[in-house]
């Protein structure tokens, strides 16, 4: 892959949970033949709503090398919608927000808005809360009385970032603000992952 001496960075936002890869490939590598645990090419993951700088694209344009707030690696291009930096940062800092406090929660099922239907959202993620939405106005054709209305990032077919309202059940483990940084909360949140595979 040819990398230019200087590069005009694009900006974007992760729209689905995506793997951070050491190289631009989904191929896996293990310490021994027949291994199935600890893929050595898997670095970490990024969650929907994470702003990124797009620093480089693979030759086939299927992968982006991105810089997130805390990590730099390759991600699938289909997992990122690109937009001007101001638009990306405005979404990332917009208030009020809804914070995911369960290990994972899912948006409400919607047969006609598949991009925001049953989307998995992970602990630590937060999304703009649409507290200004009139209760009498449906969200994607569905009433919102039993749900929080949040705004989710989407990737259009041409790769451009777009935002769409979605419903998050009020029964889901979420909060209107970050949890206080206390030992009790750290332990309580940690136990929400008990029994999950690493």
Mark where each language-model region is.
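Boundary regions of SH3-family modules and the immediately adjacent low-complexity/disordered segments
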Residues: 1-21, 25-37, 67-115, 123, ...
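A general structural signal for short secondary-structure junctions and capping/turn motifs
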Residues: 10-11, 44, 56-57, 118-119
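A conserved hydrophobic secondary-structure block that centers on an alpha-helix together
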Residues: 36-72
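Loop/turn positions that initiate beta-strands
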Residues: 47-52, 121-130
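Active-site nucleophile-His-acid catalytic modules used for acyl/amide transfer and hydrolysis
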Residues: 190-198
